[in-house]
Regions:
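Beta-sandwich/jelly-roll carbohydrate-recognition scaffolds of carbohydrate-active enzymes
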Residues: 2-160
Length: 161
């Protein structure tokens, strides 16, 4: 039994901050850093759309109203029991972005990462990722990515580099 009671993230009033990327915590962090406005929802996966193993990461993009229905079969009829089940569909990844810097594709799994930080600013509803990436050819680039799922315009998700 795990008796470690330390918090996973530093305790802050309105922010949740990840200070280093660790693939072992990626699946949990994709859930923690998710954004949603009740209409659009997206897991906190990276814009580079890594093809992680299913136990390491799972892309997730959802729009309210896109679901599949299936009949529920009961052994016997019960008054008030639902006739259909509904499952929200995981839609294609619309946030996948490939950034090319001096003929090299930005990839955190290739090259080295320094000063990594990912912050969910809950008061503003913004997910921010900052890091310094050194490419395999040795070029350093400071990268900042902001993501927002709008509450004012429910059908808009923004990504800024």
């Amino acid at each position: 039994m795990d008796t470690d009671k330390r918090p996973i993230y530093p305790i802050q009033v309105w922010d949740i901050t990840e200070t280093e990327f660790d693939i072992k915590n990626n699946y949990r962090n994709e859930t923690t850093f998710a954004l949603s406005n009740g209409y659009i929802g997206t897991r906190g996966t990276f814009e580079e759309a890594y093809d992680f193993d299913i136990d390491t990461g799972l892309e997730g993009n959802f729009v309210n109203g896109f679901y599949e229905s299936e009949k529920i079969r009961y052994g016997e009829a019960n008054f008030g029991s639902p006739l259909l089940s509904q499952s929200l569909l995981n839609l294609p990844n619309l946030k996948e972005t490939h950034v090319i810097l001096a003929d090299e594709k930005f990839d955190m799994m290739d090259g080295t990462v320094e000063e990594y930080e990912r912050v969910l600013h809950m008061k503003e509803g913004i997910l921010e990722r900052k890091l310094i990436w050194t490419s395999p050819k040795g070029k350093k680039t400071r990268i900042q990515i902001l993501r927002l799922v709008s509450f004012a315009r429910k059908n808009i998700m923004l990504i800024s580099y």
